[in-house]
Amino acid sequence: MGPVMLDVASYELDAEEREILKHPLVGGLILFSRNFHDAEQLRELVRQIRAASHERLVVAVDQEGGRVQRFRDGFTRLPAAQYFAAINDAATAAQLAQEAGWLMAAEMMAMDIDISFAPVLDIGHVSAAIGERSFHSDPQQARIMAECFIRGMHSAGMKTTGKHFPGHGAVTADSHKETPHDNRPLAEIRTHDMVIFRELIQRKLLDAIMPAHVIYTEADARPASGSAYWLQEILRQELGFEGIIFSDDLSMEGAAIMGSYAERGQASLDAGCDMILVCNNRQGAVSVLDNLSPIKADQLTRLYHSGQFDRQTLMASSRWQQANKALTALSERWDAHKQTLGQ
């Protein structure tokens, strides 16, 4: 298995994509909204992906909830992470967050999708890229909700990915469009943003971590996604993280400072990433495959899902029906609240 995760263009594979998926450096594929028409089509696309590759790929998606939910029609409308903080009763909020993690994971695994890149562990809501994707502005409250969501995912059989290390929540710039700079003192980042990562790593609840395309100017001139300081010295050595490290999408503008696509990919792997994402640019992806040194990343097999869910049986279960009803209601209440605020 190779260290590169790619994407595909539409509802089914074309001939070029079938050949690319056989490349020895390819180890994963991420799905987007453009790959989804309905549940039956999606399941068939995943079957095609499995059949095209020589080895079982890690199939992934961003199915967080709120505005970042790639599959909608026929799937539960998942609330964004911030919504759980609006529930007045802490026990109810914790239970519903856990059910959200379970339900999201179960619905994805019924499609034979291995992982959803979740949960978001960024603190606060000021970032344009993060906003309501964050559980809370208080690190401990965010950790409590994230841990519940994680336990739900694990109970279903899906591995977790905490993002975006060491924290994207305090920068207003969107790393999809530019390279954000976080100029805060390193001590503040350590005692505020990194707390949630540290505590969840200590509890061995994070199977993978995705670093931010953010430059933390007090620490390094490179984005964290391409920084050996953040990935090796801090994440591996200081925090003792033993799981998988993903890059975020190297086609994002926040990664452009690292050079060409091939240079971005090599820099991220050299810095300590186990798998790099190259999406939304076929030419860039091919350049990475053509120029990367041969490398195996067999540790990525740890990310395969271990749950078995039949979609019809899942949706007929009382647990799914109750969770679906509660989560949909929470999303609708939050939408009504935002409308009163003119958002």
Swiss-Prot record:
Pathway: Cell wall biogenesis; peptidoglycan recycling. The keyword S-adenosyl-L-methionine does not apply. InterPro entries: Beta_hexosaminidase_bac (IPR022956), Glyco_hydro_3_AS (IPR019800), Glyco_hydro_3_N (IPR001764), Glyco_hydro_3_N_sf (IPR036962), Glycoside_hydrolase_SF (IPR017853), NagZ_Beta-hexosaminidase (IPR050226). Substrate binds at D62, R70, R133, K163, H164. PROSITE patterns: GLYCOSYL_HYDROL_F3. Signal peptide: none annotated. Its EC number is 3.2.1.52. One of its GO terms (molecular function) is beta-N-acetylglucosaminidase activity. The record marks D174 as: Important for catalytic activity. The active site is at H176 (proton donor/acceptor), D248 (nucleophile). SUPFAM superfamilies: (Trans)glycosidases (SSF51445). The keyword Cell division applies. GO terms for cellular component: cytosol. GO terms for biological process: carbohydrate metabolic process; cell division; cell wall organization; peptidoglycan biosynthetic process; peptidoglycan turnover; regulation of cell shape. It is found in: Cytoplasm. Plays a role in peptidoglycan recycling by cleaving the terminal beta-1,4-linked N-acetylglucosamine (GlcNAc) from peptide-linked peptidoglycan fragments, giving rise to free GlcNAc, anhydro-N-acetylmuramic acid and anhydro-N-acetylmuramic acid-linked peptides. Belongs to the glycosyl hydrolase 3 family. NagZ subfamily. PANTHER family: BETA-HEXOSAMINIDASE, BETA-HEXOSAMINIDASE-RELATED. This is Beta-hexosaminidase. It comes from Yersinia pestis. The lineage of its organism: Bacteria, Pseudomonadati, Pseudomonadota, Gammaproteobacteria, Enterobacterales. The gene is nagZ.
